[in-house]
């Protein structure tokens, strides 16, 4: 089984109760293997940076024009033509937003961290959720991957509300 290389950067002031490098690696690995439909996907490197609200706010404002911090930002790395590099991109995850959302949604913190690592990895692989059909496909993949890891459907609360 191929193991992705994860460069885990902790830029958050409070680093208590954060997932371990092994956890992030497992979550990203499962997303990559699911996408490749094989356990032996190409060598891949991803940077995961855990930040506080101030950095998330600045990045979200600069790159998305959104005047607030967000849970996860994905920055795919575009390798210049003719160069072979295993870099997939960077994920920026805001600790405070993750904790707040997990509490509001009444889900485990570990489950929400896993979901956002998987969600961000799928963005790095080219998935998006701007159009309804894209969102449905991406949410379906996230649900399959999360359930394969023993977590519940991350969108279950939204589905209950819709019914």
Swiss-Prot record:
The lineage of its organism: Bacteria, Pseudomonadati, Pseudomonadota, Gammaproteobacteria, Pasteurellales. Keywords: Cytoplasm, Endonuclease, Hydrolase, Metal-binding, Nuclease, Ribosome biogenesis, rRNA processing, Zinc. Disulfide bonds: none annotated. It is found in: Cytoplasm. Zn(2+) binds at residues 119, 123, 129. It is an enzyme of class 3 (hydrolase). Its cofactor is Zn(2+). The keyword Ribonucleoprotein does not apply. Its EC number is 3.1.-.-. GO terms for cellular component: cytoplasm. Its main location: cytoplasm. This is Endoribonuclease YbeY. SUPFAM superfamilies: Metalloproteases ('zincins'), catalytic domain. GO terms for molecular function: metalloendopeptidase activity; RNA endonuclease activity; zinc ion binding.
């Amino acid at each position: 089984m191929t193991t992705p290389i994860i460069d885990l950067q902790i830029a958050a002031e409070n680093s208590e109760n954060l997932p371990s490098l092994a956890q992030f690696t497992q979550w990203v690995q499962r997303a990559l293997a699911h996408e490749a439909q094989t356990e032996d996907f190409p060598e891949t490197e991803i940077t995961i940076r855990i930040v506080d609200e101030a950095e998330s706010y600045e990045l979200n404002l600069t790159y998305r024009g959104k005047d607030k911090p967000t849970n996860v930002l994905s920055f795919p790395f575009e390798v210049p033509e003719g160069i072979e590099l295993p870099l997939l991109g960077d994920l920026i995850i805001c600790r405070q937003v993750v904790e707040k959302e997990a509490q509001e949604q009444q889900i485990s913190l570990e489950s929400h961290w896993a979901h956002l690592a998987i969600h961000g990895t799928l963005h790095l692989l080219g998935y998006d959720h701007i159009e309804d059909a894209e969102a449905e496909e991406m949410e379906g993949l996230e649900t399959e991957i999360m359930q394969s890891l023993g977590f519940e459907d991350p969108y279950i609360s939204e589905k209950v509300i819709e019914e």
